[in-house]
Amino acid sequence: MDQHDDFDSVSWRQDPESDISRPTTSGTDADESLEYNRDTNGKRRMSSVHEDPPQAGPLADAVDLAGIGDGVLECRVDSPLKENDGTKDAYISYLVTTHTDFKSFQKPDFAVRRRFTDFYFLYKTLYREYPACAVPPLPEKHKMEYVTGDRFGPEFTSRRAWSLHRFLKRLTLHPVLRRAPLLAIFLESPDWNAHMRLHSTRTSTGNSDGSGTGIFDNFTDTFVNAFTKVHKPDRRFIEVKEKADKLDEDLNHVEKIVARVARRESDLEADYNDLATQFRKLVPLEPDVEVPLQIFAASVEETARGFKMLKDHTDQNYLGSLRDMEAYIVSVKALLKTREQKQLDFEALVDYRNKAVAERDSLAANPSSYYASNPLTSSPASFIRSKMEDMRGVDHEQSRRERVRKLELRIDELTREVESAKTTSEMFDEEVVREVADFERIKAVEFRDTLGALAEKHIDFFQGAINTWERFVAEMEGDLDNDPEMSEHGRGGGVAA
């Protein structure tokens, strides 16, 4: 991995004037000028047959890294609806609306209803079929809502709808995942349930045909690698990991503060509603000022409704976006861990080969060491092997030559495995670099959208409060002008004061 040591670090920020900062999704429709390349890790990248493929090395620019193309694919998730109400099979479905100019779709605008399990199936399948992608995660199950029976409540369903919307938007902004055939079927197919059953059957059949030891082998490799350090860490990914940890920590602090802000907005809503109730209790006691009291109480209630709208957006949308981004960062760090394991696999194979080469060279340079008749001058393994061969009547020289021959075959096999592992590791490195750039672009778009929406809600709230109280002042001044006695009393009171 020495050739990567001089690579520039991956930036976590993008030039705001570059194309990758645009919220418009990217991608191109499949035509004769484009071809898909699939690597050994199952990830597809688009490259033009008329141009050199984009590189992810030190000369790569932001567009190369992010894989930007043309095309529009915009999705929205909203309108939670309780299905099969009154039965034990009740569930919530969400309206998924899509606008696109992809030729692979039958219409440019269409809508379907999907439930959470449909989104979960989409996520799990993409996660399995695109291991080199940091597939955006789904929102958590929120098991407490299932225990308390509030999983059909408007707050829970609204919060989940926003999270599912962000999940789909991240997919549509990803240059590879937005072209996944399963995503197109999910967005458009009226027979989605039948497709899920068929896809699940094929997947289970494929797993049963495979080796039964594959899962155990993968687990063993992961377990062993967990206690192994990389010999030559790549500075690019060290910096990405450090910045991911720092961003995760900062978002956690912001999340706690925003949650406190949402609670205070909820308290203000309750206090303003209580204030309006108390003013209305004054009406029977002060019939002469009934109209001003009623108008004032109504204005206070209107302000309380504004606080509720602001609190709902802060709690259900913006706070959820912070938690969803934290989960997305976990996916990126998991991809970095997978990349590290591939490098560990490569380095372990190199170590095995070097040990085999050293043993072969030792046998060739010092044949007598193989016989090891003296336990004081030989290794325990050589001495025991020599004694066992003596007991069996084996020719030591012939055994040594056979051992050298087997080592030569083993070295040849390990050399091929090393080259294959090196190629896989380097290809995965390049994919991870692109994936980090994709994450950067998606993160920038999402932050801009969520902060912009939060700012608009605050503008609406304060503008509404200004309009409410300006209207109250105007009505009070109008009543004062229309009531000479009240006007005279007010002026007299002012002089007396």
Swiss-Prot record:
Subcellular localization: Cytoplasm, Cytosol; Preautophagosomal structure membrane; Endosome membrane
Disulphide bridges: none
Binding residues for a 1,2-diacyl-sn-glycero-3-phospho-(1D-myo-inositol-3-phosphate): R115, T117, K141, R160
Pfam families in alphabetical order: PX, Vps5
Any GO CC annotation of this UniProt entry: phagophore assembly site membrane
Alphabetical list of InterPro entries matching this protein: AH/BAR_dom_sf, PX_dom, PX_dom_sf, Vps5_C
Name under which the protein is recorded: Sorting nexin-4
Lineage: Eukaryota, Fungi, Dikarya, Ascomycota, Pezizomycotina
Gene: snx4
